[in-house]
Amino acid sequence: MDTFQVIILALIQGLTEFLPISSSAHLILPAQLLGWEDQGLSFDVAVNTGSLFAVVIYFRNELWAMFKAWIASMVKGQHSDDSKLAWWIILATLPAVFFGFIAKDFIETHLRSAGVIAVTTIVFGLLLWWADKMSRRDLTVYQTGWRKALLIGFAQALALIPGTSRSGATMTAALMLGLSRDAAARFSFLMSVPVSLGAAILVGKDLAESPLPIDYQALTLGTVISFVAAYLCIHYFLKIISRMGMTPFVIYRLILGAVLCGFIFL
């Protein structure tokens, strides 16, 4: 890949990973518009790692408090709001892990098409709008509970379907279950840590076994750009939804889905 391609793809990954607008829908557009080939496994690992670093550093205080409380709950039997939240995040991760293992090959073979991505971008955009407008939105992140956490986890598993958007699906489910916009976003972001870490380890294992050469300069640049873009995205997204809700992202998804349909059918 040349430098321009690295910059564009890393920006797309960083900006779309945590917005409810589907990163896979955006990554398919450069290929459609510019005829770019697949960026490769090593680049995927690099930009995903950059996004992971961004959410870990942004929520470092919350994650550290949760980790300490989680350890205390196991060692000393001391339970607090932070320890409960940590357990809920772990519980919410399990459905994606389970369905990821059993459905990965089917999804890669049958669902990674532009048509599927276009449809899911539109359908789940409408579901996000409905959830944002019709739900009560008054629960904090510490009022999630294990049942709601598990249901949000199943929504995350559903997001294995390309175009759905992991953050979009989890925020939609959280809003439907009564969480506030801020709580839904924060729970979704915190959920991304174990999932992204697990995915990076699995893909990194495949990369280590690959005989293909590695362009370390491109990977470093991609990681840094993805990190900066994702960090800024998280910061400003939390500000936007507190003022405007999810409507701007719903409108964007509908337009994006229509554009993808245009590429497919015209």
UniProtKB/Swiss-Prot annotation:
It catalyses: di-trans,octa-cis-undecaprenyl diphosphate + H2O = di-trans,octa-cis-undecaprenyl phosphate + phosphate + H(+). It is found in: Cell inner membrane. InterPro entries: UppP (IPR003824). Keywords: Antibiotic resistance, Cell inner membrane, Cell membrane, Cell shape, Cell wall biogenesis/degradation, Hydrolase, Membrane, Peptidoglycan synthesis, Transmembrane, Transmembrane helix. It is an enzyme of class 3 (hydrolase). One of its GO terms (biological process) is regulation of cell shape. The chain crosses the membrane at residues 1-21, 39-59, 87-107, 111-131, 149-169, 183-203, 218-238, 246-266. Its EC number is 3.6.1.27. It is a multi-pass membrane protein. Signal peptide: none annotated. It holds the Pfam family BacA. One of its GO terms (cellular component) is plasma membrane. It comes from the Bacteria. One of its GO terms (molecular function) is undecaprenyl-diphosphatase activity. Bacitracin is thought to be involved in the inhibition of peptidoglycan synthesis by sequestering undecaprenyl diphosphate, thereby reducing the pool of lipid carrier available. Belongs to the UppP family. Catalyzes the dephosphorylation of undecaprenyl diphosphate (UPP). Confers resistance to bacitracin. This is Undecaprenyl-diphosphatase. It comes from Shewanella sp. (strain MR-7).
